[in-house]
A protein has these predicted regions:
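Nucleotide-sugar donor-binding/catalytic module of glycosyltransferases
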Residues: 1-114
């Protein structure tokens, strides 16, 4: 994976009701820098993974997947997620949350770069 200025780290577990809105809120971000998305799913038993795979098919270069092969729990899933990116900064979002501002990443990045 090429080093990017920022990686969005997105953690999920059985978030089928929310994951689409969350992913849309991430992918609507407008920035003047490159960023990627790392998704760590903790062996969801609902349709969360299928929905994530639909987005991966649409954005294969932007989205990287960590699909646990068994339920490892939130702590290990989080550790696997935040140690995966090779970026200067990380922005974090949970699978049952979403962003409302399309410039959220740009604003965060600008503040961190000051």
């Amino acid at each position: 994976m090429n080093k990017k200025p920022l990686s969005v780290c997105f953690i999920t577990y059985n978030h089928e009701k929310y994951v689409t809105q969350a992913l849309d809120s991430i992918l609507m971000q407008k920035t003047d820098f490159e960023w990627d998305l790392v998704v760590a799913d903790d062996y969801s038993t609902d349709s969360t993974r299928a929905k994530i795979l639909e987005y991966k098919a649409r954005f294969p270069e932007k989205i990287h997947l960590i699909f646990q092969e068994k339920n490892v729990g939130p702590a290990q899933n989080f550790i696997d997620l935040i140690t995966f990116p090779n970026s200067k900064y990380i922005a974090y979002l949970e699978g049952d949350d979403y962003w409302t501002d399309p410039y959220k990443l740009q604003k965060q990045y600008n503040i961190l770069e000051q």
